[in-house]
Each structure stands twice: as structure tokens, then as C-alpha cells.
Amino acid sequence: MIEKSTPAPITHAADADLIGPDKSLLIVDDDTAFLRRLARAMEARGFAVEIAESVAEGIAKAKTRPPKHAVIDLRLGDGSGLDVIEAIRGRRDDTRMIVLTGYGNIATAVNAVKLGALDYLAKPADADDILAALIQRPGERVEPPENPMSADRVRWEHIQRVYEMCERNVSETARRLNMHRRTLQRILAKRAPK
């Protein structure tokens, strides 16, 4: 989780250049407690933070003042964070965007990157991880976690990818995965976020 701690110093001049003079940061997340903690932590690291708790609010703020940096939750109460990414990219093509989610899969990560996100971080991500992702140089990757995905996680992400490709149609997804519809429904119910 995000802690209210002393800001991590930016140790390289090139990193400071990547943040640059425009320190505007839009954070879009429907988890109010997480949103406020992250906003405080990023302000402590030198950003001028604006927050939004919905897709509609995020798009409105992106249209009014497109930010130089953005941290966007993928799944919001009123839609997908991908819509906010598109709105920002439509107004400003140099925005450095990071997608956060507690319910991720490979297909949505690929979509987010195709739309212009720099990276895709799983929740809970701390402010230092987010800062590192925001200031990474082009072509540079933040170190991946040491623990590789389990076979169960790979299977789940494959199911999620096919489910998203089928526009969340359970019957079509079950056909494509060659499994019974009820089996798929049980898997989806078991792994659904609470």
C-alpha cells in the first residue's frame, strides 16, 4: 500500500529531466482511500496532483487540462480506465501514463500499452513503484517481480483474455475455451473481485 513517507529522492539528473517542468499528474481511481493516499504521496514527490473518482470525471479533467503524467485505475465504477487513456492521448500525445489494477489480465495490459500507457502495475502499487514507472526512460522497463506467475495464474489470465475478446459473453467464451458454460461460470465467480 502507499505509505505517507519521506519522498524518494530523484538521484539522476536525467530522471529529473523526464519529470520536467510540467509536473501535472492526474490520478483516476474509484477507491477513495487509495486515491487520497496516492495523491498525498505523489504531491510529496513534487507533482501537482489532480484527482478523479470516475471515468466521466477523469475524461472531463483530461479535456480541461491534459496532464503531463497520469495514473489510471483500469476498472472504475462507471467504465474502463482505457477510455480516460484515449481521452488524454487525444488531447496530448506526450503524457506519461501508468495503468493500475487489482484485477488485471494480459489482454487489457496490451490494450493499455497500445493506447499509450507506459506500464501496467498491479495493485497495491506503492508510490515509489509508480514514480519509477512514470520517470522510466523510453525503452526501459521497471524490474518485474521476482516471483513468476503460477500455472493457475497463466490459465486464469488466458480465460480472462478470451472472455474480454468475446465481449464478456460467457457462452461464446466457453465454446472458444472448449469447456462447459457452467464450469466457466464457476471459475469466473470464484475469481471475481469482491
Curated annotation (Swiss-Prot):
S-S pairs: none
Domain Response regulatory: from-to ranges: 24-138
SMART domains, sorted: REC
Origin organism lineage: Bacteria, Pseudomonadati, Pseudomonadota, Alphaproteobacteria, Hyphomicrobiales
Molecular-function GO terms, alphabetical: DNA binding
Residues annotated with 4-aspartylphosphate modification: 73
GO biological process, one term: phosphorelay signal transduction system
A Pfam family assignment: Response_reg
Keywords assigned by UniProt, alphabetized: DNA-binding, Phosphoprotein, Transcription, Transcription regulation, Two-component regulatory system
Name assigned to this protein: Acid tolerance regulatory protein ActR
Domain of life: Bacteria
The protein's role, per its UniProt record: Member of the two-component regulatory system ActS/ActR acting in acid tolerance. These data implicate that a two-component sensor may be involved in pH sensing and/or response.
Gene3D superfamilies, sorted: 3.40.50.2300, Homeodomain-like
PANTHER family the UniProt entry points to: PROTEIN PILG, STRESS RESPONSE REGULATOR PROTEIN 1
PTM summary: Phosphorylated by ActS.
